[in-house]
Amino acid sequence: FIGVIGVAVGEISNQNNEKLLSGSKIFYGDTIVVKPKSNAQILFLDETVMTVGESTELTIDDFIYDPKTNDGNFVTNIKSGIVKTISGKISEKNPENLEIKIPNGSLGVRGTEFLVSLNNKKESTVLLLGPGPENTLGMVPGNIKLTDGINTTVITSPGFQAMIQNVVSLAS
């Protein structure tokens, strides 16, 4: 397994329509489906934390992690809904090894906390929550590179966001 459901409120299931509860294991290739009026928190082995809002579907396309070296690769495909992520050890060591796919683009995440909100697969909003380049906690500053296949936007300041609409579908 690559992670566990830390918190499950309401109806959460996997691609086989098996109910997921707190403590349920998450595996490579799993699709997590969170129904309306439900939410979940997923804790991954590299200490990445995803808080998954209602009416959300995401798939773990790739997760390879070596806890001895913190090397790995993590690719998630968010198909609908809203997901808040705090990146873990994979992104901390190799920021280019964490990728978030969305219906109309993809994100390259560089060690940070961020929110992705999808509106009916037609509009994606990405918000950088932090830490920024001038944080007082001594944390490595993060940034997000958002691309729609044609244009690329880099968000480096917490509280800033970018949006893409109906451009190119990179995620299937």
Model-assigned labels for residue ranges:
Residues 1-31, 35, 44-168:
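Flexible, surface-exposed loop/linker segments and immediately adjacent secondary-structure boundaries
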